Design a protein with these regions (language model features):
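Low-acidity, Ser/Thr- and Arg-rich intrinsically disordered low-complexity segments
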Residues: 5-30
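N-terminal domain-onset segments
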Residues: 27-82, 91-92, 107-243
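Short, solvent-exposed aromatic-acidic interface loops
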Residues: 99-107
Length: 243
């Protein structure tokens, strides 16, 4: 993966505020605590990300690399360096994007069982805690946690770098183009044709072995590429995370 330090996620103008009531035992009055969530500068919808993850899984399966099979309500992605990301669907119209960068996430420990770490949920809706639970289930650190409300992504307003960068994780077409190029290079394949890669990204979970073969070309037939395995891996994503 690229080694450049990620930018702190930019937050466009606008924020939402969730209000919690805290009652002091020494006073009859209640204090009102405001904790804002800020919009995340990410245009990709949950469906867009699910489609990109299907392509990533197809390429990895075709070249013989491990990938996470989709589960109902959750798509998990990780690489050997310790980076991971998950797309979760807690309910209709809702989604969570959770993950961790092994070098750049400074919100360390919030997903590990037994460690409090940085609070990434705060007073956001309770279903955001599904992201923390997912990290703990995988015994993984949690660096970032974003919630989708049906129209855009939101994050808790906290100062520490969470390690998320859309150029490093498979959440944009540009990022996945780079990932496909790197996977082809790492497995000694020819440099992928850019137009063929674009067609593959557009196809998403409906990609075919022929479309995959146009991207993963082996000189002289070596190393071998299992295009059918790649197409099967992509098809598994068609109904794994329903909208």
């Amino acid at each position: 993966m690229p080694g450049a330090r990620p930018r702190t996620p930019a937050s466009p103008a606008g924020s939402r505020t969730f209000t919690g009531i805290a009652t002091s035992s020494s006073s009859i009055r209640s204090s009102v605590d405001h904790m804002a969530v800020l919009p995340v500068d990410l245009d990709s919808t949950p469906d867009d990300i699910a489609s990109l993850l299907a392509v990533d899984a197809a390429v990895r399966a075709a070249v013989g690399l491990d990938h996470h099979a989709p589960a109902t309500g959750a798509l998990h992605w990780s690489v050997d360096e310790g980076m991971w990301m998950a797309l979760l669907r807690p309910g209709p119209g809702r989604a969570l994007l959770a993950g961790w960068h092994h070098e750049f996430s400074l919100t360390e420990g919030s997903g590990n069982a037994g460690e409090a770490g940085t609070d990434l949920v705060g007073d956001a809706p309770g279903w955001w805690r599904r992201g923390v639970e997912h990290a703990r289930t995988h015994d993984a650190c949690l660096g970032f946690l974003y919630g989708w409300d049906g129209s855009r992504w939101w994050r808790l307003d906290q100062p520490a770098d969470d390690g998320f960068d859309p150029e490093l994780f498979p959440v944009t077409r540009a990022a996945l183009r780079d990932i496909v190029d790197e996977l082809a290079d790492d497995t000694l394949l020819d440099a992928p044709d850019p137009d063929a890669v674009e067609a593959l990204l557009t196809a998403g979970s409906a990609l075919t072995a022929v479309e995959l073969g146009a991207v993963l070309h082996a000189p002289d037939g070596w190393p071998e590429v299992d295009l059918d395995a790649g197409a099967r891996a992509a098809r598994e994503f068609r109904s794994a995370v329903p909208a």
